[in-house]
């Protein structure tokens, strides 16, 4: 199995996230899996801030998509800051996991001028692949939960609003204070 890891933590050497990444790579390699690591802070070419007016997307976006297409698993690793993943990882998601490649919309009533903006998502290039999320929180669990419908907003947003749109099967690994 080929696993594409997208690592988005600023401390690429000695953080808890780096330990998760390195341990995962070591264990997965021992099991015979191939690893394709995208270390966003160490990439030679950095993505510009997302701008929908840039069309077609930069070549690096197409390269990332090709790497994902050649993988069986996408594994996002990052920390939680202000109830979001790091900006560099969010920007990567905005560019790479974008509609028409990652998912598209199908109209409820095709050809209707009245319902042309109403529809449902149709998974794209990553449909059926496994999506793993590792998010570290740096504090006790209770500080990120309010025991309501909106518990764990960062995870819900990535899982439901990103990976589910793309038709991915998801697994979530969370770490609080250690």
Language-model segments: residues:
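N-terminal beta-loop-helix "entrance" segment that forms/cooperates
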Residues: 39-58
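A short, flexible beta-alpha/helix-coil linker loop
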Residues: 9-11, 138-142, 177-178
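A short beta-strand-loop structural module common to alpha/beta enzyme folds
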Residues: 33-45, 173-176
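Helix-loop-strand module that forms the ligand-binding subsite of alpha/beta enzymes
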Residues: 56-156
């Amino acid at each position: 199995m080929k696993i594409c890891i997208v690592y988005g933590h600023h401390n690429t050497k000695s953080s808890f996230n780096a330990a998760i990444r390195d341990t995962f790579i070591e264990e997965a390699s021992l099991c015979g899996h191939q690893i394709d690591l995208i270390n966003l802070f160490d990439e030679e070419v950095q993505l510009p801030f997302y701008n929908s007016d840039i069309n077609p997307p930069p070549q690096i976006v197409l390269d990332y998509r090709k790497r994902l297409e050649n993988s069986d698993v996408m594994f996002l690793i990052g920390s939680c800051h202000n109830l979001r993943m790091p900006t560099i990882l969010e920007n990567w998601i905005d560019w790479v996991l974008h509609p028409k490649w990652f998912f598209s919309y199908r109209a409820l009533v095709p050809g209707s001028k009245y319902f042309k903006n109403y529809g449902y998502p149709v998974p794209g290039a990553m449909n059926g692949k496994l999506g793993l999320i590792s998010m570290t929180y740096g504090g006790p669990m209770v500080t990120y939960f309010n025991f309501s419908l909106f518990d764990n907003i960062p995870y819900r947003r990535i899982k439901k609003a990103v990976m589910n749109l793309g038709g991915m099967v998801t697994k979530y690994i969370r770490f609080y204070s250690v």
